[in-house]
Amino acid sequence: MKSKFLRLLALFLTIGVVAASCGSDSDDAAPATTAAPATTAAPATTAAMATTTAQVEVVADGSLLDTVQARGTLNCGVSGSAVAFSETQADGSVTGIDADFCRAVAAAVLGDAGAVNFVALTASERFTAVQTGDVDVLMRNTTWTQSRDSSVGMDFGPTTYFDGQQLMARVSDGFSASSQVSDVDGAVVCTNVGTTTEKNIAEAALLAGAEITLLGFETSDEVYETFIAGGCDITTTDGSALVGRKVKQQPADQEWVIFPATPISKEPLGPTYGQNDSAWADAVNWTVYAMIIMDEYGITSADVDAACASAEAEVGRLCGGEGELQTGMGLPADAFHQVIKQVGNYSEVYNRNLNPVGLYREGSANAGWLDGGLIYAPPAR
């Protein structure tokens, strides 16, 4: 037991330093030491990410909310290569659930869901981009952790997707959906170098008594190319990313399986922004909460106009009716009406982006609280 503890301590000290210095999640993006893959480039129709704070218009002594409204555009940091979360398409458009949450914030703050400049960021670029003002908010599969909340200078909004790290292997190698980490003894595991994914799998294998060989790669594309070619037995990252890659890249002559059923880590993903700006945090957070509340009432983009025309109580307030609280937040009274009308409620955004890759709310942590899940919003009153 003492020997295992000492090995675990050494592992934390070695891998923890690398992961902290890179600031990277298990999030399907390249570390800062390499150029981002072509698919992560910002859409051609939008401006490139600013490289100096001099390029960012800032309202003196005001909230970022004032800055964004004066600018008329939301600069939203995304991955650009995360399947079903934020993918830059051939025509320059950006699709995915993260991209839709960017649009929702733009609809609330600016009245126009299309007023978004999507900025593709690598894992190591993302926090710097927020700190320098190059982006206003991250909607970029970024895990909420204690260190990021306390020492990196970030604040985190509501969790929009509850994820967890899992492993993926070939059925032909003897793995199944019921496999456990202890079953990977002797395996070669591919993952992104210098990430929390690397740290998590090394720790989990050690605790399970499994000896593994870790192969680290600078980009996720390299990870999956090596896995497909048979250069490693297993790949590991967030479960949602594995599902997306399986749908998009599994060869016809291979069958991939994801395990264990219970993830080896907790990965709460949601909006991230600079710390100590309550007005901006309120605008971002309540955009998400409004989408969740309207979902609970069954109000969708198709019927929100009719619902708001006669709504009372909580829905009426969110629609901008009597007792509304949006103007006191620095938003238009109908801010959340526009969010639902232009983008949709939480289920609409989730279903159109994640259902096609096999990620369903039912029975998952991402179900609403009334359905046994963790998606929940405080009352709008």
Where are these regions (language model features)?
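Short helix-initiation/N-cap motifs at beta->coil->alpha
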Residues: 61-62, 116-128, 176-177, 214-229
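Bilobed "Venus flytrap"/periplasmic-binding protein-like clamshell domains
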Residues: 75-84, 94-109, 143-144, 163-225, ...
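Extracellular mucin-like PTS domains
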Residues: 30-57
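C-terminal motif of bacterial Sec signal peptides marking the signal peptidase cleavage site
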Residues: 17-21
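Extracytoplasmic small-molecule ligand-binding "clamshell" domains
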Residues: 56-138, 372
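Bacterial lipoprotein signal-peptidase II cleavage site
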Residues: 23-31
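Acidic, polar ligand-binding/catalytic clefts
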Residues: 103, 107, 115-183, 240-264, ...
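Extended ligand-binding regions for polar small-molecule ligands
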Residues: 50, 54-59, 100-103, 107-109, ...
